[in-house]
A protein has these predicted regions:
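Extracellular and select intracellular beta-sandwich modules with Ser/Thr-enriched
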Residues: 2-5
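Cellulosome-associated attachment modules in secreted, modular CAZymes
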Residues: 8-175
């Protein structure tokens, strides 16, 4: 997740600062942030606690995105993830007991907009080290948006956070 806030300066510029976190709230210092405004952009460094800062022009439309390489040796994807994806694909609850938008986004492994048994199979293959057409990747989305309309048949979201006409303090949350 990326929590960003902008502070107004009298010099016609803003400082956009934030922190990149996982859905569970852990800082992700190995992630990278990209801040794009107008025709300019920057890749601020991310510190060990996951924070970053970038200067932007006041009044600009700004997009903040985050990315992070997936480390296959971390074994972060397990057969339980495959089981949960399979459960979601047939309308059952995952092992956590409740399904939310983040579960559907994570389960849509091939990113075709729906959760199916093929996603579960690819997750299972990946968890045991077999190759798949799609590689696992981190997805960072705007944590302030309402994703309650996401279902197993409609996994639609935009990467990053868009801030329009940033001319005063602004806050965005990217998970």
């Amino acid at each position: 997740a990326v929590d960003t806030s902008a502070s107004y300066f009298n010099f016609g510029s803003l400082t956009l600062s934030g922190i990149i976190k996982s859905v569970s709230g852990y800082a992700l210092p190995n992630a990278s942030a990209t801040v794009t405004y107008g025709s300019s952009g920057s890749k601020p460094s991310v510190s060990s606690d996951g924070t970053f800062a970038a200067d932007i022009d006041s009044g600009s439309d700004t997009t903040v995105t985050a990315s992070m390489d997936y480390n296959a040796s971390s074994k972060a994807i397990t057969s339980l993830d495959a089981l949960d994806a399979l459960k979601l694909s047939v309308g059952l609850k995952p092992s956590s007991g409740t399904a939310d938008a983040y579960d559907f986004i994570a389960a849509d492994f091939n990113q075709d907009g729906k959760v199916t048994s093929l996603d579960a199979l690819d997750i299972l293959k990946n968890s045991v080290g077999l190759s798949t057409t799609q590689s696992p990747k981190w997805v960072f989305i705007d944590g302030n948006k309402d994703y309650s309309s996401i279902t197993k048949n409609s996994v639609i979201y935009a990467n990053g956070v868009s801030l329009t006409d940033v001319s005063a303090d602004a806050t965005a949350n990217l998970k």
